[in-house]
Swiss-Prot record:
Substrate binds at residues 298, 502. It comes from Acinetobacter baumannii (strain AYE). Residues 313-717 are annotated as: 3-hydroxyacyl-CoA dehydrogenase. This is Fatty acid oxidation complex subunit alpha. One of its GO terms (cellular component) is fatty acid beta-oxidation multienzyme complex. It catalyses: a (3S)-3-hydroxyacyl-CoA + NAD(+) = a 3-oxoacyl-CoA + NADH + H(+); a (3S)-3-hydroxyacyl-CoA = a (2E)-enoyl-CoA + H2O; a 4-saturated-(3S)-3-hydroxyacyl-CoA = a (3E)-enoyl-CoA + H2O; (3S)-3-hydroxybutanoyl-CoA = (3R)-3-hydroxybutanoyl-CoA.
Length: 717
């Protein structure tokens, strides 16, 4: 054994070839944490000291290659400021450079995921051989940063600026064929041939049949483009990237382009310094803090879900009650992920509608070449439409998705319970109705749970799993595991009106209503909140949700929380409802909707909307300060999120933030309501609440925040 460290071993194979093997002890994956980087340095020194080594094959002892840097170390590193980040990165560059500069050929044998720092490790090798099962990529942009271990410098020299920018800005892992086509890897082989293929490449390089030094030299020099070609390449790249990423919201892509441009005409070492300086600028942004926090929160949510696996009973057969758009979407989602599902309704027209929805979604998958026609047929065969309960004795879980009316749901649920086994789980896809209330219609309330899908089901990643007063842990666990199997992210919440997401959303709509009442133009509110980072403003959002749905939900919330969700005035949303302007569903709401060239509903300004709401505007019509609009909208939403934590509706700030991002489109680069409060400053946020407390209870700071401010505490760190 030439080197035996905690993360890396080096041992001779044959013919002067050594295996440089990453296998981080005590971890399920390889990652570049501090310990691995130190071991990397020691392993390189051991290779340099051994004159018998003529070439290296770089391998992994895990099912993945290397998944990247240790993201949990970022917070501490990035909190030190730009200079400290550069001072941290430059020694890492020296270590990677010393491996690249070894006077012997090096081939990476990529057996699985090689992402971020993992692929940057592959780039310091002279050749890269990839298994057919592997994927490679530099996805750091998703974290609000960009590759910092030399990836931007080496990849742009290897595959050209245009391709490198696309790889890094899109942040999507590449499959073998795409990686080979772009020139990022040199060969793709079957998994069982990987080590042999990599070893053979090393032998060819040692024998001189391959000029590995010339291959390496390309990465050590400036980009091979003259100044005019460089200017054209970067102008094209900037146009494409900045059209998709607003630098005010996502600064990392522009900082990446700036550092690439600064380093393009420089040799490796100077270009790496430019990369480090640009990386440091990105790393200290609030967006990087929020997006890295989001990644860590995602891990927290997945870990919480995984804990339910042992308590779940298997779901070999599911059923959905109600074959509308929602029922059809649920059936499609289950079937497309391999779970057979019965779809029941009371009439053939309804069943036809549900099957049509599933068929349409599958057809789109085939058209986009994400599914083969034969797979579409197999998926449709897993959905069995029926008018009876005959087959329900074989069902492990039933998802009720009938109309959002408590009396209708109670009748359907009670009828269903009589037609299933005693241990069958019954889940209600309700968005606002109390699970504890609905459970009163059942003989076995312990088997009853809420399973709230968001519309459209195939696109929205979140599922709220709602625990009623008598819901068993087995019912929760089984529902969580099914949601995961369906490709969704489940978050378990306790029962209350609106559960978590809608309970938080309705005060946001309430804040909008109050702003309009006080004289704000709803278009200004929409523009301000869109620029703030929401996918759409609140007026447009309520049109998309459906104004009738919004009014019904508001009534449920007002009954549950009369002190802060029951206004003493009629607002613009209710005015639209009374005028039979329901939003997109009947083409008039706050906006008017007409089909565009692609057949999608596009909004246009409708003067009639202003006439409808005019009698309900009591304040003087004026242009509000943009920050006042942001503060009033965000305080109402964030305060209710904190109250959900106070009331133990949701267990952690991590889960609350993830739910708001996945469920209602909270701007990801702001990290969620709790992260937003942290970044505002808890004491400063409480002061804002006090400033607007005269507007009503929704604006009063929750006691949790006052306590946190008094003790200088934050949600994160």
């Amino acid at each position: 054994m030439i080197h035996a460290g905690n993360a890396i071993t080096v041992q001779m194979l044959a013919d002067g070839i050594a295996e440089f093997r990453f296998d981080l002890q005590g971890e399920s994956v390889n990652k570049f944490n501090r310990a691995t980087i130190e071991d990397f340095k020691a392993a390189i020194a051991a290779v340099k000291a051994n004159n018998d080594i003529k070439g290296l094959v770089v391998t992994s002892g895990k099912s993945t290659f290397i998944v990247g840097a240790d993201i949990t170390e970022f917070g501490q590193n990035f909190a030190q400021g730009e200079k400290a980040i550069v001072d941290w990165l430059m020694p890492v560059h020296e270590i990677f450079n010393s491996f690249e500069d070894l006077d012997l050929p090096k081939v990476a044998a990529i057996n699985g995921m090689a992402l971020g720092g993992g692929f940057e490790m592959c780039l310091v090798c002279d050749y890269r051989v990839m298994s057919e099962a592997a994927q490679v990529g530099l996805p750091e942009i998703k974290l609000g940063i960009y590759p910092g271990f030399g990836g931007s410098v080496r990849l742009s020299r290897l595959i050209g600026i245009d391709n490198a920018v696309e790889w890094m800005a899109m942040a999507t892992p590449k499959k073998p064929a795409a990686a080979l086509k772009d020139g990022a890897v040199d060969a793709v082989v079957a998994a069982d041939k990987l080590l042999d293929a990599a070893t053979d490449l090393v032998k060819q390089a040692i024998s001189g049949r391959l000029n590995w030094k010339a291959k390496r030299q390309e990465k050590l020099e400036a980009v091979k483009l003259n100044p005019l070609e460089q200017m054209m390449a970067f102008n094209t790249a900037k146009g494409a990237v900045l059209a998709k990423a607003n630098p005010a919201q996502y600064p990392a892509p522009k900082l990446l382009l700036d550092s690439l441009q600064a380093g393009a005409s420089l040799a490796r070492d100077e270009a790496l310094k430019a990369e480090a300086e640009g990386f440091a600028k990105a790393a200290v942004t609030p967006q990087a803090e929020a997006l890295i926090g989001l990644f860590i929160n995602d891990q927290v949510v997945k870990k919480a879900s995984k804990q339910h696996e042992k308590g779940a009973h298997p779901v070999n057969q599911a059923a959905v009650l109600g074959a509308g758009i929602m029922g059809g979407g649920i059936a499609y989602q289950a079937a497309s992920k391999g779970t057979p599902i019965i779809m029941k309704d009371i009439g053939n027209p309804q069943l036809a509608l549900g099957m049509k929805e599933a068929n349409n979604l599958l057809t789109k998958q085939v058209e986009r070449k994400k599914m083969k026609p034969v797979q579409m047929g197999e998926t449709l065969a897993r959905i069995r439409p029926t008018l009876s309960y005959e087959e329900f004795k074989e069902v492990d879980i039933v998802i009720e998705a009938v109309t959002e009316n408590p009396k209708v749901k109670e009748i359907v649920l009670a009828e269903t319970e009589k037609n299933v086994r005693e241990n069958t789980i019954i889940a209600s896809n309700t968005s606002t109705i109390s699970i504890t209330r609905l459970a009163k219609a059942l003989q076995r309330p312990e088997n009853f749970v809420g399973m709230h899908f968001f519309n459209p089901v195939h696109m929205m990643p979140l599922v709220e799993v709602i625990r009623g007063e008598k819901t068993s842990e087995e019912a929760i666990a089984t529902t969580v595991v099914l949601a995961q199997k369906m490709g969704k992210t489940p978050i378990v919440v306790n029962d209350c009106p609106g559960f978590l997401v809608n309970r938080v959303l309705f005060p946001y709509f309430g804040a909008f209503d109050l702003l309009v009442k006080d004289g704000a133009d709803f278009q200004q509110i929409d523009n301000v909140m869109s620029k703030f980072g929401w996918p759409m403003g609140p007026a447009y959002l309520i049109d998309v949700v459906g104004i009738d749905t919004g009014v019904h939900g508001a009534e449920v919330m007002a009954e549950g929380f009369p002190d802060r969700m029951k206004p003493d005035y009629k607002g613009a949303i209710e005015a639209m409802y009374e005028a039979k302007r329901l939003g997109q569903k009947n083409d008039v709401g706050f906006y008017k909707y007409e089909l565009d060239k692609k057949g999608k509903k596009a909004k246009t300004v409708d003067p009639t909307a202003y006439e409808v709401i005019a009698p309900f505007v009591t304040g003087e019509k004026r242009e509000f300060d943009n920050q006042e609009i942001i503060d009033r909208m965000m305080l109402a939403l964030c305060n209710e999120t904190v109250r959900c934590l106070e009331d133990n509706i949701v267990a952690t700030a991590s889960e609350a933030d993830m739910a708001m991002i996945m469920g209602i489109g909270f701007p990801p680069f702001r990290g969620g309501p709790c992260r937003y409060i942290d970044q505002t400053g808890v004491a400063e946020y409480v002061a804002l609440c006090d400033k607007y407390a005269h507007l009503g209870k929704a604006y009063e700071a929750p006691q949790m925040l006052r306590d946190m401010a008094a003790n200088n505490k934050k949600f994160y760190g």
